[in-house]
């Protein structure tokens, strides 16, 4: 995952890149935990580049817009995704569950239980209840 500082243009995330920071998402990190890390790095990248932006002394890197995708907020209906019937303990299922864990807005309901954390260990999904 990562954060990118871009020069704003008329598109969505289509402007040239000023700077970026990449980081590894750990196997058991929830969407909400990842969001908080993204916010931390967003602040860091902004502070790092603030003075050079004010002075107009920064380099721009054009991006290949053919490699990008955009999904609008309305393209995902979370209410249809959060009720999960867990039948198999797979990494794919674990990733799906943890992608929906965002306590300010929703928690996935797995086999009837609100889940605040999913841990994948020894090919098993361990669910922590709300």
Regions found by a protein language model. Name each.
Residues 62-130:
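Internal anion-binding site segments
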Residues 1-71:
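Donor/substrate-binding cores of folate-linked one-carbon enzymes
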């Amino acid at each position: 995952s990562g954060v990118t500082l871009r020069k704003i243009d008329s598109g969505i995330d289509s402007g040239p890149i000023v700077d970026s920071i990449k980081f590894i998402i750990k196997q058991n990190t929830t969407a909400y935990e990842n969001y908080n890390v993204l916010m931390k790095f967003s602040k860091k990248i902004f502070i790092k580049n603030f003075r050079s932006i004010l002075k107009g002394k920064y380099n721009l890197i054009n991006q290949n817009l053919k490699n990008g995708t955009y999904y609008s907020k309305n393209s995902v209906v979370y209410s249809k995704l959060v009720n999960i019937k867990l039948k198999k303990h797979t990494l794919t299922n674990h990733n799906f569950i943890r992608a929906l864990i965002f306590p300010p807005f929703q928690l996935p309901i797995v086999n009837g239980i609100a889940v605040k954390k999913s841990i994948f260990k020894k090919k098993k999904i361990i669910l922590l209840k709300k």
